[in-house]
């Protein structure tokens, strides 16, 4: 019985309790970055910020993309301390029904990575600055995913893990890994006003945008609609999604990309 319990405990520990937007697979150490949803959101943030304003990223764009993987799989460049691969700690900001924050974890991580990027850039180490900026973009990107606004400490309660994983897999399939375009998101990307003047405020505002659903589809509604699509076998084609679900998915990602752009210009 003790042996069985030990095996069961190990199995539980080996399962990640939370998913994230995809990165197109795991890149090799110091290799060319694979491209997925996280890279797309980070790229759009970079573009919205104005490429000519960010030469320190332009000359280290591959490292910037590798940075977007770190919170899920750990750092993929030499010379960077660990402390990533932290999905179990929740890439989330959770709210109660009154709008108060009950769990600010992603807010904290955005600030930490922003500060590291700013310090590295001040030290003349643009390579590390780009990496940390990519990691920062990861946490902001996750806040555009409605399941990252759900959890036992939120008024929505926990999401269905199968819905969480399926939604992210379907979205990632809209990415063209060669052209870096998305058949789902491209039409939604445009400049919008982002609230807040500090990393913490900007991260919280990004989560609040997803939480409030821009006045339409809130996390609980998006979860219920996607779950119904999944049960009907219609989840794999965003063209078959309810227009409100599809549009809110795009608007959430667009706001996140704009939040990244604002912070990149502040580094």
What is each of the regions a protein language model found here?
Residues 19-131, 146-267:
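N-terminal, motif-rich segments that launch catalysis or mediate targeting to/interaction with membranes
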Residues 129-141:
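Short alpha-helix carrying the canonical HExxH Zn2+-binding catalytic motif
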Residues 14-18:
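C-terminal segment of classical bacterial N-terminal signal peptides
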Residues 4-12:
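Sec-dependent N-terminal signal peptides
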């Amino acid at each position: 019985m003790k042996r069985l319990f030990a095996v069961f405990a190990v199995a539980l520990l080996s399962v990640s309790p939370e998913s994230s937007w995809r990165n197109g697979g795991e890149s090799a150490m110091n290799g060319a970055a694979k491209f997925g949803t996280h890279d797309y959101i980070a790229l759009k943030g970079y573009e919205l910020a104005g490429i000519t304003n960010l030469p320190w990223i332009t000359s280290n764009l591959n490292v910037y993309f590798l940075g977007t993987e770190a919170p899920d799989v750990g750092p993929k460049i030499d010379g960077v301390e660990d402390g990533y691969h932290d999905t179990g700690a929740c890439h989330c900001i959770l709210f109660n029904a009154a709008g108060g924050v009950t769990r600010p974890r992603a807010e904290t991580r955005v600030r930490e990575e922003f500060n590291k990027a700013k310090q590295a850039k001040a030290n003349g180490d643009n390579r590390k600055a780009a990496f940390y900026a990519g990691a920062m973009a990861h946490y902001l990107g996750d806040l555009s995913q409605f399941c990252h606004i759900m959890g036992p400490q939120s008024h929505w309660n926990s999401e269905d893990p199968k819905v969480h994983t399926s939604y992210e897999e379907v979205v990632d399939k809209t990415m063209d890994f060669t052209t870096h375009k998305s058949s789902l998101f491209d039409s939604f990307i445009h400049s919008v006003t982002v609230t807040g003047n500090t990393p913490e405020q900007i991260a919280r505002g990004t989560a609040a945008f997803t939480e409030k659903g821009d006045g339409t589809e809130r996390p609980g509604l998006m979860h219920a609609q996607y779950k119904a699509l999944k049960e009907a076998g219609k989840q794999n084609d965003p063209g078959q999604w309810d227009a409100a679900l599809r549009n809110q998915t795009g608007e959430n990602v667009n706001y996140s990309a704009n939040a990244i752009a604002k912070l990149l210009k502040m580094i």
